[in-house]
UniProtKB/Swiss-Prot annotation:
Residues 1-186 are annotated as: DHBP synthase. Catalyzes the conversion of D-ribulose 5-phosphate to formate and 3,4-dihydroxy-2-butanone 4-phosphate. Catalyzes the conversion of GTP to 2,5-diamino-6-ribosylamino-4(3H)-pyrimidinone 5'-phosphate (DARP), formate and pyrophosphate. D-ribulose 5-phosphate binds at residues 21-22, 26, 125-129, 149. GTP binds at residues 235-239, 256, 277-279, 299, 334, 339. This is Riboflavin biosynthesis protein RibBA. Zn(2+) binds at residues 240, 251, 253. Its EC number is 4.1.99.12, 3.5.4.25. The lineage of its organism: Bacteria, Thermotogati, Thermotogota, Thermotogae, Thermotogales. CDD domains: GTP_cyclohydro2 (cd00641).
């Protein structure tokens, strides 16, 4: 973030690339620092719509008027500052700075030449508008930014080669949407403890903790058994109604859950229960995937046929729960290296990992083999035991 701030102070915008939107790229620059030269650069080399972004709530409090839309765009009435035409680079820069100062709508002339867009929160929408506000704030400036979509010589807005050459030519920093999301989750506390209660179970007496969730709105929860050592024994368990509740033999989820609860009862630890049914695709789609597996596809192939990636999960909620519980260092019980990476990228230190196996049955053997071969799950040991 210090490097980002230095670039902005030198008058260099950041290029923000969204690989989930066919590599669409925007210039991003803090509105409070914008100058005539930066505006001129944006217009010359960006060529897309020139916009200033701010939080929607902030704009509404200042009286800005939202335009009607039939496709979800969050545009407000465009404005100008001052008495000139408003179109020059000098005038547009001043308009952006006045917006960043917190000036009210009635102080501007409208309609003007600076398009205003309201952000609705990065956790709700991972778009350039919302990301630009986080970038500006992370670099130490107010939550107001100027963004311009980058078009190539033919007006194409999705030319990654052109964007990267532009970055190289002018020595501009490049960020991807995932980079911003990672810093956003690492630096902000978006979940906090809401309630906790005693939970007596067949495995022992635990605490169950719920959370106020401003990250994804889902009712994730944690099971805690004290005392907690450093590093804390942690298991991230993705919801599996069929395995956890109905004791399905198609997977090993229920038996893994039971095995960790037994461990917790004896040694202490935290079970994080994430509402990520079917590796993040939901129960209905999981059942559809089961149907495809009944026809001979494996679990990865079934996901892809349904239009999903092999694993749709993000472990940001798990990292946020640990932060809400005051945990920074963990002993992670997992066979899945993606969970280790998923915690570490959000600022949780995984000191060590330990394997946690479930039950192998004739019904889940092929499924487990697929997870090992195609998803990288470390299950070789359990297959050696079964085959011996």
């Amino acid at each position: 973030m210090e490097e980002l701030r230095e670039a902005f102070e030198e008058g260099k915008p950041v290029i923000l690339i969204d690989r989930n939107r066919e590599n669409e790229a925007d210039f991003v620059f803090p509105a409070q620092l914008i100058t005539e030269d930066v505006v001129s650069f944006f217009v010359t080399y960006g060529k897309g719509l020139f916009c200033v972004t701010a939080d929607e709530e902030d704009l509404l409090k200042r009286g800005f008027v939202k335009l009607s839309s039939n496709y979800g765009a969050n545009y407000f009435v465009p404005v100008d500052w001052g008495t000139g035409t408003g179109i020059s680079a000098l005038e547009r820069a001043e308009t952006c700075r006045k917006l960043a100062e917190g000036r009210y709508f009635h102080e501007f002339r409208y309609p003007g030449h600076v398009t205003v867009i309201g952000g609705i929160g990065f956790q709700r929408r991972k778009g350039h508008t919302e990301a630009s506000l986080e970038i500006s704030e992370l670099a130490g400036f107010s939550r107001h930014a100027v963004i311009v979509e980058i078009l190539d010589e033919k007006g194409n807005s999705h030319n990654l080669d052109y964007v990267l050459k532009l970055s190289e030519k002018f020595s501009l920093p490049v960020l991807e949407m995932d980079d911003v999301w990672r810093e956003f989750v690492k630096r902000k506390l978006l979940m906090k403890k809401k309630a906790e209660a005693t939970l007596p179970t067949d495995f022992g007496v635990f605490k169950v903790v719920s959370f106020e969730n401003h990250l994804d709105g889902k009712e994730h929860f944690a099971i805690v058994k004290e005392p907690l050592e450093d590093p804390v024994a942690v298991r991230i368990h993705s919801e599996c109604v069929t395995g956890d509740v109905l004791s399905s033999l198609r997977c090993d989820c229920g038996s893994q859950l039971a095995n960790f609860l037994r461990y917790m009862s004896a040694h202490g630890g935290i079970l994080i229960y994430l509402r990520q049914e079917g590796r993040g695709i939901g129960l209905s789609n999981k059942i559809a995937a089961y149907s495809l597996q009944d026809k001979g596809l494996d679990t990865v192939e079934a996901n892809r046929v349904l239009g999903f990636s092999e694993d749709e999960r993000d472990y940001a909620p798990a990292a946020q729960i640990l932060k809400a519980l005051g945990i920074e260092r963990v002993l992670l019980f997992t066979n899945n290296q993606r969970k280790t990476v998923g915690l570490e990228k959000y600022g949780i230190e995984v000191v060590e990992t330990k394997r946690l196996y479930g039950r192998v049955t004739p019904h889940n053997r092929f499924y487990l083999s697929t997870k090992m071969k195609k998803l990288g799950h470390e299950l070789e040991e359990i297959f050696r035991e079964v085959n011996s």
